[in-house]
Amino acid sequence: MARIAGVNIPTAKRVVIALQYIHGIGPKKAEEITEKVGIPAERRVNQLTDAEVLQIRETIDRDYLVEGDLRREVSMNIKRLMDLGCYRGLRHRKQLPVRGQRTHTNARTRKGKAKPIAGKKK
């Protein structure tokens, strides 16, 4: 198994698919990386040379925010919104939907298990 950005990527899969196992790299970025390095799309990870793996690793480190750095960046952005006290920050702080979804009936995933109301039983 090749290890790129702290992730063991599967060897039997195509390079474009295997790169998507890294948090922060999707289909488009994986294709961009293979084009920059000059690897054919149908090449598999176990067919890569050590030099090609090194090129991929350097390209990702230089040009993309992945794994722990990306997670840290996202959490810092959310923390910044909460510190500002803006509407989105307040919604994050109260653990409610942030992007305008209704909460009267839905949003159970974000709000948690429904709390029973006493006195409604008959």
Swiss-Prot record:
UniProt GO MF annotations: rRNA binding; structural constituent of ribosome; tRNA binding
Claim: tRNA-binding is one of the keywords in the record: yes
One term under GO cellular component: small ribosomal subunit
Signal sequence interval, chain numbering: none
Region called Disordered, residue ranges: 94-122
InterPro entries named in the record: Rbsml_uS13_C (IPR027437), Ribosomal_uS13 (IPR001892), Ribosomal_uS13-like_H2TH (IPR010979), Ribosomal_uS13_bac-type (IPR019980)
The family this protein is said to belong to: Belongs to the universal ribosomal protein uS13 family.
Assembly, per entry: Part of the 30S ribosomal subunit. Forms a loose heterodimer with protein S19. Forms two bridges to the 50S subunit in the 70S ribosome.
Name by which UniProt lists this protein: Small ribosomal subunit protein uS13
Organism: Methylorubrum populi (strain ATCC BAA-705 / NCIMB 13946 / BJ001)
